[in-house]
From Swiss-Prot:
Signal sequence extent: 1-7
Coiled-coil parts of chain: none
Tissue-by-tissue expression: Paneth cells of the small bowel.
Disulfide bonding pattern of the chain: 52-80, 54-69, 59-79
Organism: Mus musculus
Region (Disordered): 1-44
InterPro entries: Alpha-defensin (IPR016327), Alpha-defensin_C (IPR006081), Alpha-defensin_N (IPR002366), Beta/alpha-defensin_C (IPR006080)
Upper lineage: Eukaryota, Metazoa, Chordata, Craniata, Vertebrata
Pfam family, one: Defensin_1
Subcellular location: Secreted
Protein name: Alpha-defensin 8
Amino acid sequence: LAFQVQADPIQNTDEETKTEEQPGEDDQAVSVSFGDPEGSSLQEESLRDLVCYCRKRGCKRREHMNGTCRKGHLMYTLCCR
């Protein structure tokens, strides 16, 4: 299963900032929603729990490539865990 998304950066909460790796210029955290054309969201638990990043240089350990994402005219790898 692969996805293509258009990404906008999201803000980390203070709790996430303390426990998660900080994204640099090469890594941008994104919010990803999954749904069908009628607009109802997918309820499959494995999709709801995904945390995804748009990365310039490939996925990190414990992440899997799930497609691509675009910010403006730049293409990134969509890495999810």
